[in-house]
Amino acid sequence: VRLVRDFPENALRVTAGDIFYASDGFQSTRSAAGITLARNFALQPYRSVRPAGDTQFDIERTSRVEVFVNGQRVQTLRLAPGRYNIRNFPFASGPNDVAIRITDEVGRTETIRFPFIFDATLLGAGEQEFSHAIGVPSESTPTGRDYDTGGYVFSGFHNIGITDALTAGANVQLSDEQRQFGANVRFATRIGTFRTDIAVSHADTASTDFAVRTQYRYTDDLASSAGRTLSASAIYRGRDFATIETTAEPSNPVALDLAVSYGQRLFWDTSGSIGYGRQFGRGDTPDLDTYSLTLIQQITSEISLSFVESHRAGAEGNDDTRFFAGVSYAPFGSPHRFAASLDTGTRSSRINWSYAPSYTLGDVQADATLERTPADYTLSGSARYTHYRFEGTVQHDENLPRDGDLERIALTSLRFGTALAFADGHVAASRPINDSSVLIAPHPRLRDYRINVNPREDEEADARTDWLGPAVLPSLTSYYVHQVVLDAPDLPIGFELGDQIYGVEPTYRSGTVIRAGTGGTVLLDGYLLDAAGKPLGLHVGTFTAVDEPDRPPIKFFTNRAGRFRVLGLSPGRYELWVEVFSDRFYRFELPEDAAGLYNIGRIEFPTE
């Protein structure tokens, strides 16, 4: 159980209760109950916090703006006059040269170039990322959770973007049994990105020790046809180095771990990578060398092959070579996918079929797998159905021993999930809600008519009203802007749905209500005349509901013949006002059975 309070304007989240906290460097996590304060960039999803150079440009007139990264156009926008920053545009990791081509409404073109380095692991200059948590240790038990009120846990880190190419930070973790202090630095160059972490620890069961990790990564720019990637790492852990999870004597059987990997696109839609690793053991742990080779061949847009060879060479001659080969077939435009693989390391083979429609609502997702090992055959399969109001899953797993003397094991499980959504006095049944939700509540006069939410061309929708009441959109990501479209295909003439397009920006695990329909059920048709019986042509006026004083006035206008048609009225008393005669009105009443197109005939307005 936990409470969450967000401060979106500062991208801060405070959590109290059973907490989950972020970690950095050599930090680890330990279950705890307490409070956390963290910078959460997900609270400002449209704000870029990664480096993009000190690059602003001005637009004097409404213009078409094309963004080029390393000569390749990645985005085209139409922007209004103002000052803009390329922090708001997408860029791939690696060394990038960016050009902004601005074309105004009369065809004049200006190109502005911004050569700079960008890497998604860095913070922009002046940006800060942090997480601080304090509490008491806890652990899960068969009866719930057990809290160690005699102990404590503190975990925190803080990273700062010093420049767009340099980020540095520090971190600390403390408990009643262990202390750890660390620091890191990350910097980007045209030959790649580097990161180094260092940490010092002291545990009650061990002496003071340290750990160091250095990483390197290079990724080709977007314009490269080779798509090269290169990564390397070196990690050293001292014999007595301990993390916050360490409650006994530390165990670090590997002193130094080295790894390097290189990959690129080759030929004929083939890509490959090679890797090498070396572990230097400590004490009785032998040294270990590992080699790997991976090839992926995209034969067609539907068929791909993969091959992996790995070799492990131990110091005592315990060599091991493994091969993995796989093929997958995904027919174009089909939700079906077929795959088969062979693994010599586990001496197993498997075949798999899956069915995953692009739109799952109102459809079934299914998969089935048959695996063969030296000991048995394993058959597993599942099917999941998603309805507007619930989800249901059936899962079957069966183990068939190849040795007839062993017991056959079969397990079938059924799961059903639904939810009740509460918002602003409205209640509705929904399929399980993952984050935020929007509840669409129809006006009482529209309850007998179906309202589709975000309708599609195949007459399906993301949600709809029915005999169970309001519709619910259950899976909206917090702090993003979502468009909600309403459609009522069976609504009779005269019944008013009101606004049909809404924009919502929900907060964390919140519920939003959209009220569909104004209550209007009458399309009023008639003629407006003056006291002498002549048409009041080309006049503007309003209808005001006497019985509903909070209801906004309904504006109308007449044609040259004085005729008007007004949507949004309902049974009850009204006052008709004409703008040029602001000191007088005409009162009338629509009967209780008035619905649809209602002809009120000729209205003689008291113009004298």
Q: Model regions: which residues?
A:
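Flexible, glycine-rich linker and terminal segments associated
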Residues: 1-64, 69-79, 103, 108-137, ...
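Core alpha-helical transmembrane segments of integral membrane proteins
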Residues: 132, 136-139, 144, 154-172, ...
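Short acidic/polar hinge/loop motifs at secondary-structure boundaries
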Residues: 79-91, 96, 471
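C-terminal structured "cap/appendage" subdomains that terminate the fold
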Residues: 551-556, 560-569
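A short tyrosine-centered beta-strand micro-motif
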Residues: 84, 96-98, 482, 574-576
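Outer-membrane beta-barrel translocator/receptor signature
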Residues: 148-156, 164-166, 178-181, 347-352, ...
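Short, flexible loop/turn segments at beta-strand junctions in immunoglobulin-like
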Residues: 88-91, 473-477, 566-568
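Surface-exposed loops/turns
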Residues: 93, 478, 560, 570-571
